[in-house]
């Protein structure tokens, strides 16, 4: 009997029969075997079920005392000496090094790709690591069984094998922070000490561990919160809902291995149907019977594979679960009590282990083959025979070895020399590593048998870069190329099948932009010879100026002056103005200009250089502008105003404008009122002039207050006047008989508080000359380019414009503007100060048009380029024409050699190749050569009999007694690789040659642990979903090249096509039968699709109600199993019923598609039970039923969709939830725990359960009986004689409750 069996034999159905008050305590059997963690757990459980809490506590106490007693008798400690490194370690490492050396050699010969080399290295180290671990354990076992380290790890006191392995074996492979495995393992252990490199690599993992833990805690806490919120209102409210429904429990499998056994899943359940023995037809258990450990074992031993049990998923209790459907309360192995808050228990049971789930374990390079394929090694030496009908296709393993892949299940036979025969079954997809008739040694690897869907292994496409290890010229060997152009017009080149890219060694020079080679292919150059040169050319020509600059780091500058102009008549002085320096220009005519462009800056065409300081054209306040005879044009930027073309008079009608933004209540004057200067027109605003007020307001907000100066005359009837408002009146022209102005005025009609009136406003006149009074400077250079300073008058306003201002306004500006002749307007002029030739104290302004050319500084040769040398070809003051060369930069060869690789044609030459003596190698021969000139040889190939080639390369010449090789390096690229170079390209060392596209195995751990649980419970669409079968049928599978063509022939003969996305691998074979909703490719299933497929399928044969229920049932099963798989894979045990409660909350709603005659609206989410009741009512009244689709809600969505808006609002999106509840006038019935906690009432669970339940079901007053005020007497045997304890597991309490019931 297994140890577990021995214990759980005791976990009998004592609730049903055993230890009533008068039954003697059952005898205690003597047990004599080793007790580990698991056995200890079973022991306590057994004692608890058999003898109750008090005795178990006593026993646990005794065990503790026992443990401490012996733990303190003696002790072990570990010293450095105890860390014994297995002696065979060195030899194993050497073996691994040799294997890897061989793989690297194959890689340098171009026989395997970079990916295959990497994979081989990783797998080799993993295997060796395991072997060292075994050796280590054997070493301890045989030579030093009492070693303290070994004892600790072995007994489970501290540490485990993998930790000991790091102490005395080897630390093994490490992953980098991106999760890629570094192919340099840590060969040492902590006992020997790590090298510096190993230490750095090793510290990656430690940091990652800390960060992960911190993130995990937060994630796990949030998951628990969402779970509690979704299931907090699930409380046991009924004893039995009486449902006939149930769910089928069976073994939970993952591939071939049992994850949870049926026996384990049955314990604590209530049966929904009688269980009948399959052979004897004897009834083993009846419906509604609880399953304890004994019964579960009996059922499992009878060979029954499926049992129908009651479950929270099928419970029909309204908004809760009943005791029968929930089953045992796991805390004390008997039926759950009424009022138990099972929802919260479920949520915490699922959420709590969250922290133990890894975020995602490191993604190990390849999976160790052990998991995916079973390795077959020859049990004896012999010959392999294949049967005639064995169908295989050639296949390349992930280590780059040639093998055969079996297409149809079959077997192979191994025949020994002494007539031994052994046959091995080969399943479809297995790999044969030997050929028919091959001789094999004992323990040689013959084949890897693929296990049917063993681990949920899937592959993903990944890319790996192939990098050139040497500089040189590209040569493709037997590499057919396919060209693809995408929609954007980008062309990619891919390899159609595998081939070689050779890099022929040579020195590659990168040429700078604009460099031209001065040598031809085949030229011989010496060190220091010029290979290429760039010329520096002037664009515009002019006079050379070489500025004095000490800063030669960035190279020297050469300036070429195209044109210059000096203001001979004006001198420059500096004033400081408001703490800033200001440059002023005084002309000989006494005018002063402010420089707008400071010396040292550049000025473009039509930009302002200086502006005249002039107060003649300054007004006192704002006003109206009128032009008389002035013509203007807009030139240059808008904000500079209008240029005056024709002079004339500018008429200015002053007015004072206050722009305000205040309430109208603050206004102190009326519209049209005449005010004196200094009046407060608005609070805190005073006017400067006397005049008539105009108030501009909008929506009782003041915008502007305008004060118009002038003389006001009241008139009775302004309409009779001949002069219109807004006209200019000349002096002496009468307006009315009584009014004759003596100067030019502007007439305006106004409405005053006293009545209509005329306002005569004074007009100021400014005379503007045709030409400004400033001379224009001009100069023309030898090249014919001219530059000048032109004086311009600009008016900032247009005719009739109102200028809003309180203070003074400039009405005319006189500016000096730079003009460069039109053929080169993009040039800019530099502003410089120069000393006067006669008087050094006087500084003049000079404008120069410069072209600045930068000379490259000389560069010493490095790996990728030769040294450069720049020669200047001009002197200070030289006059040069445009297009002249002023300097040449030469690129010099580093070593002597022959020039190659200059491509003829239109393409720009960016690189030049020189083949030097370093790139050639001479091999002396003893016999005739068996290679030809031009042949590509790999390292190790024979050049002549018995003479292997020391290098890979190309044969350049064969002379008597020697072969001249040009070194080269072959790189194997696999089919489908993306090529980054073309044939004949020149590459530097470190350039990318190609991207290898390969499939790498994704182990189940990619989305594993917490992220996967969250994805499931939030019902999210997985990233790479599998294809699901929509109807049952038979698979028909054919291949179009690499692309699978997948069809399913359904029962009625319909053929349905399924499209398989690239990167998805099939998990079905030709002719395989599939059921509805079965996955056809690898990857996680999308639960929403699953629900839809099941619903559509069942609807064709059953009614909507039945179909919805069955579809939801299937999806519920899927969820329970998936969640269990994740937790079990991490070694966490959770009872199914907890997951079922949460899943029930996720799958209880349907979406209304059409309300029919009901009061439901389309799109509404309703409980399935509710809508089925409504439809039943409709069937009686003859109305049209509501149509609906079952939906799946993630836990967050389900929490927000509960009946209780208080609970939803306290979870997330408070404002939205409360607003909607208010608009819809919702009521909260306070059924759950959370609502009641928030309101501050007693919660309806535990003792508070009865409070509310009784209020609900209170009897009529006349039926009420007198209740005894005290409890009925205690049964005498409640107090046990021996340990004087009331024990809550003694069924005396049950009797108490029964008495209560009888009295009620």
From Swiss-Prot:
One function term, GO molecular function aspect: DNA binding
Compositionally skewed regions (Acidic residues) per UniProt: 1256-1268, 1294-1304
Pfam families: RNA_pol_Rpb1_3, RNA_pol_Rpb1_4, RNA_pol_Rpb1_5
Textual note on the cofactor: Binds 1 Zn(2+) ion per subunit.
Gene Ontology cellular component list: DNA-directed RNA polymerase complex
InterPro entries membership: DNA-dir_RpoC2_beta_pp (IPR012756), DNA-dir_RpoC_beta_prime (IPR045867), RNA_pol_Rpb1_3 (IPR007066), RNA_pol_Rpb1_3_sf (IPR042102), RNA_pol_Rpb1_4 (IPR007083), RNA_pol_Rpb1_5 (IPR007081), Rpb1_funnel_sf (IPR038120)
Keyword set includes Zinc-finger: no
Region Disordered: start-end pairs: 1-23, 1256-1304
Positions annotated to bind Zn(2+): 241, 315, 322, 325
Domain of life: Bacteria
UniProt protein name: DNA-directed RNA polymerase subunit beta'
Upper lineage: Bacteria, Bacillati, Cyanobacteriota, Cyanophyceae, Synechococcales
Gene name in the database record: rpoC2
């Amino acid at each position: 009997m297994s140890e577990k069996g021995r214990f759980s034999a005791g976990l009998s159905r004592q609730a049903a029969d055993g230890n009533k008050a008068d039954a003697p305590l059952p005898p205690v059997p003597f047990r004599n075997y080793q007790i580990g963690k698991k056995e200890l757990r079973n022991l306590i459980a057994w004692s608890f079920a058999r003898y109750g809490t008090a005795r178990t506590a006593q026993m646990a106490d005794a065990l503790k005392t026992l443990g401490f007693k012996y733990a303190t008798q003696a002790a072990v400690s570990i010293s450095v000496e105890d860390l014994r490194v297995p002696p065979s370690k060195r030899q194993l490492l050497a073996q691994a090094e040799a294997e890897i050396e061989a793989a690297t050699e194959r890689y340098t010969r171009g026989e395997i790709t970079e990916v295959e080399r990497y994979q081989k290295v990783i797998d080799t180290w993993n295997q060796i690591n395991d072997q060292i671990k075994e050796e280590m354990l054997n070493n301890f076992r045989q030579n030093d069984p009492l070693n303290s380290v070994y004892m600790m790890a072995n007994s489970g006191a501290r540490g485990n094998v993998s930790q000991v392995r790091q102490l005395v074996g080897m630390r093994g492979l490490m992953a980098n922070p991106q999760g890629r495995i570094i192919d340099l393992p840590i060969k040492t252990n902590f006992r020997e000490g790590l090298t510096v490199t190993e230490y750095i690599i090793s510290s990656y993992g430690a940091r990652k561990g800390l960060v992960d833990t911190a993130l995990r805690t937060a994630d796990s806490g949030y998951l628990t919160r969402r779970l509690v919120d979704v299931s907090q209102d699930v409380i046991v409210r009924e004893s039995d809902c009486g449902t006939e429904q149930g769910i089928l429990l069976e073994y939970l499998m993952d591939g071939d291995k049992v994850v949870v056994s049926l026996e384990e899943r049955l314990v604590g359940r209530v049966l929904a149907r009688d269980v009948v023995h399959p052979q004897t037809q004897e009834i083993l258990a009846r419906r509604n019977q609880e399953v304890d450990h004994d019964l579960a074992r009996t059922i499992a031993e009878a060979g029954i594979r499926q049992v129908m049990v009651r479950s929270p998923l099928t419970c029909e209790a309204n908004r809760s679960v009943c005791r029968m459907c929930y089953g045992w309360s796991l805390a004390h192995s008997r039926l759950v009590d009424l009022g138990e808050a099972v929802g919260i228990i479920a949520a915490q049971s699922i959420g709590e282990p969250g922290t133990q789930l890894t975020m995602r374990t490191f993604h190990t390079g390849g999976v160790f083959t052990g998991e995916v394929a079973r390795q077959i090694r020859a049990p004896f030496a012999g010959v392999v025979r294949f049967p005639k009908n064995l169908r295989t296709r050639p296949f390349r393993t992930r280590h780059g070895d040639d093998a055969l892949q079996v297409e149809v299940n079959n077997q192979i036979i191994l025949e020994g020399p002494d007539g031994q025969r052994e046959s091995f079954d080969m399943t479809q997809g297995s790999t044969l590593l030997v050929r028919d008739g091959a001789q094999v040694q004992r323990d040689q690897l013959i084949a890897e048998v693929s296990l049917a869907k063993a681990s949920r292994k899937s592959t993903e496409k990944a890319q790996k870069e192939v990098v050139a290890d040497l500089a040189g010229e590209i040569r493709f060997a037997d590499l057919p190329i396919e060209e693809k152009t995408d929609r954007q017009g980008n062309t990619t080149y891919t390899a159609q099948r595998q081939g070689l890219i050779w890099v022929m060694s040579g020195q590659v020079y990168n040429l700078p932009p604009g460099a031209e080679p001065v040598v031809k292919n085949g030229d011989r150059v010496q060190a220091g010879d010029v290979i290429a040169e760039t010329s520096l050319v002037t664009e515009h020509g002019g006079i050379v100026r070489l500025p004095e600059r000490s800063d030669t780091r960035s190279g020297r500058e050469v300036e070429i002056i195209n044109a210059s102009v000096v203001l001979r008549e004006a001198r420059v002085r500096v004033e400081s103005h408001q703490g800033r320096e200001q440059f002023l220009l005084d002309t000989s005519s006494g005018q002063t200009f402010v420089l707008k462009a400071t010396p040292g800056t550049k000025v473009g065409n039509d930009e302002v250089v200086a502006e005249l300081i002039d107060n003649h054209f300054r007004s006192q306040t704002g006003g109206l502008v009128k032009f008389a005879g002035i013509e203007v044009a807009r030139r240059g930027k808008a904000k500079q105003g209008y240029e005056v073309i024709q002079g004339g008079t500018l008429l200015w009608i002053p007015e004072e404008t206050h722009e305000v933004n205040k309430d109208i209540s603050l206004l102190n004057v009326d519209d049209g009122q005449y005010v004196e200067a200094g009046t407060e027109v608005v609070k805190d605003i005073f006017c400067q002039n006397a005049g008539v007020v105009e108030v501009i307001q909008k929506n009782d907000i003041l915008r502007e207050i305008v004060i118009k100066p002038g003389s006001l005359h009241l008139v009775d009837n302004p309409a009779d006047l001949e002069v219109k408002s807004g006209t200019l009146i000349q002096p002496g022209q009468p307006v009315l008989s009584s009014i004759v102005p003596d100067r030019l005025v502007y007439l305006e009609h106004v409405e005053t508080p006293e009545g209509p009136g005329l306002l005569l406003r004074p007009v100021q006149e400014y005379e503007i000359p045709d030409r400004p009074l400033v001379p224009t400077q001009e100069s023309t250079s030898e090249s014919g380019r001219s530059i000048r300073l032109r004086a311009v008058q600009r008016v900032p306003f247009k005719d009739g414009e109102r200028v809003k201002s309180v203070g003074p306004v400039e009405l005319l500006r006189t500016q000096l503007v730079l003009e460069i002749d039109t053929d080169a307007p993009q040039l800019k002029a530099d502003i410089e100060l120069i000393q006067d030739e006669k008087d050094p104290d006087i500084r003049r302004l000079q404008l120069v048009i410069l072209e600045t050319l930068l000379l490259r500084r000389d560069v010493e040769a490095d790996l990728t380029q030769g040294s450069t040398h720049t020669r200047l070809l001009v002197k200070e003051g030289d006059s040069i024409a445009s297009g002249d060369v002023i300097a040449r930069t030469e690129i010099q060869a580093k070593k002597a050699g022959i020039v190659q690789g200059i491509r003829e044609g239109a393409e720009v030459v960016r690189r030049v190749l020189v083949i030097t003596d370093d790139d050639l190698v001479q091999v002396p021969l003893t016999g005739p050569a068996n290679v030809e000139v031009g042949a590509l040889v790999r390292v190790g190939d024979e050049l002549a009999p018995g003479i292997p080639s020391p290098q890979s390369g190309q044969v350049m010449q064969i002379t008597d007694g020697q072969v001249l090789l040009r070194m080269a390096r072959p790189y194997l690229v696999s089919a489908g690789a993306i090529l980054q170079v073309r044939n004949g390209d020149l590459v530097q060392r470190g350039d990318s040659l190609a991207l290898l596209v390969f499939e790498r195995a994704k182990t189940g751990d990619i989305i594993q642990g917490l992220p996967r649980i969250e994805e499931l419970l939030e019902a999210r669409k997985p990233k790479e979903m599998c294809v699901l079968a929509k109807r049952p049928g038979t698979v028909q599978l054919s291949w179009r090249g690499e692309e699978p063509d997948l069809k399913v022939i359904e029962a009625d003969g319909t053929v349905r096509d399924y499209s398989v996305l690239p990167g998805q691998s099939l998990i079905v074979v030709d002719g395989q039968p599939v059921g509805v909703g079965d996955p056809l490719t690898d990857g996680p299933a999308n639960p929403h699709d699953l629900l839809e497929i099941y619903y559509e399928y069942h609807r064709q044969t059953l009614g909507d109600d039945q179909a919805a229920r069955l579809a939801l049932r299937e999806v519920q099963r899927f969820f329970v199993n998936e969640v269990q798989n994740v937790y079990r894979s991490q070694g966490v045990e959770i009872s199914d019923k907890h997951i079922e409660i949460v899943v029930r909350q996720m799958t209880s709603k349907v979406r209304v598609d059409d309300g029919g005659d009901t009061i439901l609206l389309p799109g509404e989410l309703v409980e399935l039970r509710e809508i089925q009741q409504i439809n039943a009512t409709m069937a009686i009244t003859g109305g049209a039923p509501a149509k609906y689709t079952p939906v799946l809600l993630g836990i967050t969505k389900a929490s927000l969709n509960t009946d209780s808006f208080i609970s939803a609002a306290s979870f997330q999106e408070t404002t939205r939830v409360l607003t909607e509840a208010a608009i819809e006038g919702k009521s909260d019935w306070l059924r759950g725990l959370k609502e009641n906690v928030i309101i501050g009432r007693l919660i309806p669970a535990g003792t508070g359960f009865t409070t509310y339940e009784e209020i609900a079901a209170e009897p009529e007053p006349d039926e009420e009986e007198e209740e005894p005020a005290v409890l009925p007497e205690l049964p005498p045997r409640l107090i046990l004689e021996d340990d004087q304890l009331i024990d809550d597991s003694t069924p005396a309490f049950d009797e108490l409750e029964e008495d209560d019931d009888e009295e009620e």
